[in-house]
Amino acid sequence: MTPDDEAVAEVIALERALLTREVRSSAAALDELLDPEFTETGVSGRRWTRAEILAELLAEADAEAEAEAGQDRIADHTMAGRWLAADVVMLTFETDHEGRRVRRVSLWRRSGGRWRVLYHQGTLVPPAPAQETAPPAAQ
């Protein structure tokens, strides 16, 4: 594995950590992983600042803990990364959570020797149309 591959693997591990209830419920962990200039465009199209998303994630974690529902980690699929610049990696992946599939992209920036997510966007994947099934063949 090349150093570039190792860095992408590290960023993927950090993104997957962000999908865990443990990290999403920890202000300190989120503070370490979100870049000071972090912004997000959510599936609704709303733009979120770093402060807004921190508050939202912590509130969601509290609600999940109270309900004792949900899973410990949001399921992700096909996560892949590629370098965009010397210190910027883009991740693309899909998640399934609460009955919704979302296509996602995150930009991670390395600064001071550590990786932090700079930008994140989610786009809702519409449900696939129901497949019609052919009636059973006549005997």
Residue ranges and their predicted role:
Residues 2-32, 37-139:
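A beta-strand edge to alpha-helix "cap/lid" segment located at domain peripheries
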